[in-house]
């Protein structure tokens, strides 16, 4: 299997036309562009060093690939001509590979896969094993050297570790001198990539090989997948037969002839969703015929390409941060994103959870985040991938300003919570007013007809008919719907204006008795503890709530008289 390493260059990434670039290019000055491009280049360089030199993956491959594609797009947008740094520059070692390790061209989508396959013959497909690449050198059938992939030209001496790994034959059946390239992987039992992901399998192997000594148990947990025999027969079928004769059965079992895109898609799906003894991150498609090993270079060749698994995580750019304040004062940050595709869904908005989580992550417009689907349906924020070099200033609400007793009026700073109170009031858990939803309240607020929670109760047909966006027929229906509120029972009205949960308490049907209750009296009710009792007492003593009760009394609502 080809190395699961990130040897990517700008030439290997998907290029966009000038028109598509124009639609996707950020609206930055050249100074801002230079700053942002430099920051992302430095972040990627840090990931490269950790991954290739230390064997530690700080970021999933799919997010790395998307980040590098983003960098490539920005460089193209702003005509950056300086060459990008080699991702493997810090991974070199003292030993030269007898045959360089090539990289792999990662195809972006099915369109690219079809284009790559077009006109090619003698094609084969393998799973892209997620491990660490190695060169094995045999002299007269005896293992004499194991070299890490390094920068593709030179790597580290892994021979001492290789002596302990049973999956690496120390002596071949025949006294042949040859060179093999393959993947050392962490053995897994019935591993389904779609369900379990990569489970840090590559990092485990890299960590073992970075040690001076490894235990027999650790060595036994490492497997070998030979994916090339550079100086072997020119014919692929003969190479596979030779590898099988040497005992490398995986090479034969997981290498299949490939005729078209449909077959490639089937194998990719099969290996993604069915049990395998190793983690994978896609498939490798290769031509059986290739240049002689003497011409190989440490760069992606034309005869090999990778088609990665579907993204489990997408890289999304944050466009705006909204702070939605619920009716009880809870602040919920929501991120507005440049739309991204995950599975068959388009994600353009995502919750950041609580205000404290947002503050910890410090997500600003221009940052890039990782997004996945929880339960395959609900967009989920997994974390920050990279930050904008220029940090946007933001107006952030203070948690102490919003609570259960705040924002009963449409005052500045109260827009979100006041609107949430209205939506709750007309919703299924409140008065259940037919056809009255968020859009209705927005029109009434924007037209200046509502500034308090119950102002709508005094609106008449003429006032509604003059509201922009409400035709005469619509205003008639709205008025009829609003009038049904008068028929709702007292208990329903209590919930609609925000009564805290009262458990199984039996509530009297009049406001006066409830307003007179003490904390101790509330606590005597079944299912009500000290905290809830205090909230109920505070609710009925709140001046804003008392004012609402007086309005409802004036409107003749049952229970408030």
Swiss-Prot record:
It comes from the Bacteria. Its EC number is 6.5.1.2. Keywords: DNA damage, DNA repair, DNA replication, Ligase, NAD. The active site is at residue 128. GO terms for molecular function: DNA ligase (NAD+) activity. It catalyses: NAD(+) + (deoxyribonucleotide)n-3'-hydroxyl + 5'-phospho-(deoxyribonucleotide)m = (deoxyribonucleotide)n+m + AMP + beta-nicotinamide D-nucleotide. One of its GO terms (biological process) is DNA replication. InterPro entries: DNA_ligase (IPR001679), DNA_ligase_B (IPR020923), DNAligase_adenylation (IPR013839), DNAligase_N (IPR013840), NA-bd_OB-fold (IPR012340), NAD_dep_DNA_ligaseB (IPR050326), NAD_DNA_ligase_OB (IPR004150), RuvA_2-like (IPR010994). Signal peptide: none annotated. PANTHER family: DNA LIGASE, DNA LIGASE B. Belongs to the NAD-dependent DNA ligase family. LigB subfamily. Catalyzes the formation of phosphodiester linkages between 5'-phosphoryl and 3'-hydroxyl groups in double-stranded DNA using NAD as a coenzyme and as the energy source for the reaction. This is DNA ligase B. It comes from Pseudomonas syringae pv. tomato (strain ATCC BAA-871 / DC3000).
